[in-house]
Amino acid sequence: MKLFAIYLGGRAIKCNTELHDVVFSCGNKIEDTYKDLLDKWFGLPDRLHIDSWVELKYVDGFEVVLSNDKPISKNKLFFINLGGYDKNKFEELHESRFFVGKDDKNIKLRAKHSLLVGFDQVHTDDIYDVDDCIEIKEVSGLYVNLIKSNKKENLEFNNGYLPIPNQVIKSFKKSIL
């Protein structure tokens, strides 16, 4: 079983532009997460799609392992989403990254020194402690365990429009009626 971070896109009632959210889900392949993504999406199911996804296999010198056992390590997996502005653009810009650390204070400091360097008015938007804020237990009853690793492996981002198949959406909509 693999842990995925998924950047969702879609629409909600009364919105003028595409909306986004980042969620975490488990499966053997990304397609296994589709129903869970629909459960977690706040907007219109018919417009939900994946804009980016990544398997969280190695992060910050740690191997990410899903297990039935509660973690014994004090290290935690964090997702940081930092926002900032460029005076020449009409938008808030974001940069996101995954970190491992013992507490969010240290992680916030690391993020502020490595994300959106050189941008105006940088601020922290969302910080998630995956173990505490995202209930991994509810996605197949598995816990995130972090094992120190010497293996250096970059995350492989899968970027591009990936729609949730219509038959999955239809089945989901029937299940919630």
PLM feature spans:
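The feature marks the first
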Residues: M1-K35
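A cross-kingdom feature marking charged/low-complexity
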Residues: M1-L3, Y7-L8, V54-F90, V117-G118, ...
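A structural feature that tracks compact, well-ordered secondary-structure segments
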Residues: L8, V22-V23, G27-N28, L82-G83, ...
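A cross-kingdom feature marking solvent-exposed beta-strand/loop segments within repeated
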Residues: R11-S25, P45, F90-F98, V117
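Generic "edge-of-domain/loop-turn" microfeature
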Residues: I13-C15, I30-D32, D60, K87, ...
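Short edge beta-strand segments in beta-sheet-rich domains
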Residues: H20, H94, V122-D131
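A short, charged, amphipathic alpha-helix used as a generic interaction element across diverse proteins
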Residues: K29-L44, D104-G118
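Conserved short beta-strand edge segments in small beta-sheet-based binding/regulatory domains
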Residues: D46-V54, D120-Y128
